Amino acid sequence: MSKVIVVGGGASGMMAALSASKNNNEVILIERNGELGRKLRATGGGRCNFTNNREIEDFFDKVVNNKKFLYSSFYSFTNKDLISYFESKNLEYKIEEENDHKVYTKNDKSIEVIEVLNKDLINHNVKIMYNKKVIDIITEETTEKDDSNKDKLKYLIKGVILDNGDKIFGDKVIISTGGVSYSKTGSDGSMYKILQNHGHTLNRLYPALVPLTIEEKWIKNLQGISMKSVEISCKIKKKKISKTGDMLFAHFGITGPCVLIMSSYINKIIEKEKVELNIDFLPNLNADEISSRIREVPNKNIINNLKQILPQNFLKEILALLSLNDKKASDLSKVDEIKIIEYIKNMKLTCNGTTGINTGMVTSGGISVKEINSSTMESKLIKNLFFTGEVIDIDAETGGYNLQIAFSTGYLSGISV
């Protein structure tokens, strides 16, 4: 039996504490807020898309950074295992197959997930310390034999120091403090500095799943217009990246599920240079089919012919840009028709940044996976120190994948202590 300290009461920290407690360990969960799961509470607009119903092998394609690192985590505690766990706790859920196979609570309430986990922590005698911030970890030097049987200097975790000066000693420590996104929920990134001071490498932090700012000023006129099932693509180092989904025009640029996913693939590039985005608003129709729609009723205004397949206010702005507002289909030249189709099938927008790391849903970057044993989540530098979730340099697309990463890495670290 070991004394295990878990730092951070988010999704991964709660799961780590639960799985650690099942090995008859004494578990202490330290949370800086007055409640557990504050970021989890806001997930999916409060609906809590806690996992995805795709096959677990399909999850790797949705991981943006360091997908191979997650092999042991995903297979130790799969999405089906997570769903079964919540089922066993009588949490009702629903699978929205038409919505990218996302899994939500039946009542669209994230608080239900938190309540299940909280109750289970109590049932497993996990001691929860609220409103306590860890400001350092306690280590001591030790030695272990290397491959050539020579003594090698290593560090051993001994506990943590709280902001009031108290020291809590333990045999194992699990770091589940998250990234820097949504800092108002308590994840301010202070643990990164602590870990750096103890020798760990911090890979640069970037905003992920974040809205994109657009250089073109006229886009403000489209503010508030929502577009369904668009395809956004760009070229990064000669490789085409393409994502499909809904998007929303905003005063600063563009947002929505499709945009957020794309942001995770270009966030590092747009720190250095602008990125040209190509947007196809009707990916299921080719140019000839759109041409037929434009000219469907010759004596009608172009907008009237297209409003069944595109939002009317979107069409008004596009046609205004082309000075074709009130033109009838019969009066439209072939050149102008091609221009309209080009705007619909291949609108070019210049992305010049994001709305910032605090507005991202998750943090890209974090503690280097090279310094963590992926089979156990244990630090390779400090014995008996473990990591979970967003504090590690791993992130994924929207759709429940990031929460599954949190639960899976939390579970694996907990059973490994």
Predicted feature locations:
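Short hydrophobic core segments
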Residues: 5-7, 30, 134, 167-181, ...
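An anion/pyrophosphate-binding glycine-rich loop and adjacent beta-alpha core
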Residues: 34-42, 50, 56-57, 92, ...
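N-terminal Rossmann-like FAD-binding beta1-loop-alpha1 element of flavoenzymes
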Residues: 3-29, 413-417
